[in-house]
């Protein structure tokens, strides 16, 4: 099962990481001073990402 994990880093900031069902970390967040802020970021991703497009910025445009 995919999951978000909330944790505190060495600087005391709240962060999250997103893990795949095989345990691999797929991405992680920036640091947040408040736990409520990191939880809001997770909810925003859940709400807004289902229709997100993929933009390949590695291709050259002329």
UniProtKB/Swiss-Prot annotation:
* UniProt KW RNA-binding keyword: no
**Family from the record:** Belongs to the UPF0339 family.
Q: Name it.
A: UPF0339 protein Atu5359
Give the organism the record lists.
Agrobacterium fabrum (strain C58 / ATCC 33970) (Agrobacterium tumefaciens (strain C58))
Q: Does the keyword Transit peptide apply?
A: no
Keywords, in A-Z order: Plasmid
Q: Which residues form the signal peptide?
A: none
PANTHER family under this entry? PTHR40606, UPF0339 PROTEIN YEGP (PTHR40606:SF1)
| Domain of life (superkingdom) | Bacteria
